[in-house]
Amino acid sequence: MEAEQLRIFLAVAEQGSFTAAAKALFVSHSTTSRAVSALENELGTALMLRHHRTVTLTPAGEVLQREARKILDQAEELKQAVQSSVEC
């Protein structure tokens, strides 16, 4: 599980579609699809229900959305703390 996969997953969840997330992140549709599929394979469960042009989160996807947001927020805080210590 990589931070970039989590970032893409969150974008798809927030945008409600792979296409919209890809546009927002300036990546290809296949990049977003592969990232979410890799997470699903690693976790052994579906994270999103894919409809014609939209997606909805499964219960597992809702858990991942909540926890991934925490992880990425903490990673950003860590980065800022380290950068601040170097500037001193």
Model-derived features: positions:
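Short helix-loop hinge/linker segments at domain boundaries
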Residues: 52-55, 62, 73-88
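Residues within the DNA-recognition helix of helix-turn-helix
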Residues: 28-31, 35-38
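Short helix-boundary/capping micro-motifs
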Residues: 11-28
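A short LG(V/I)-centered, amphipathic sequence patch enriched
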Residues: 40-57
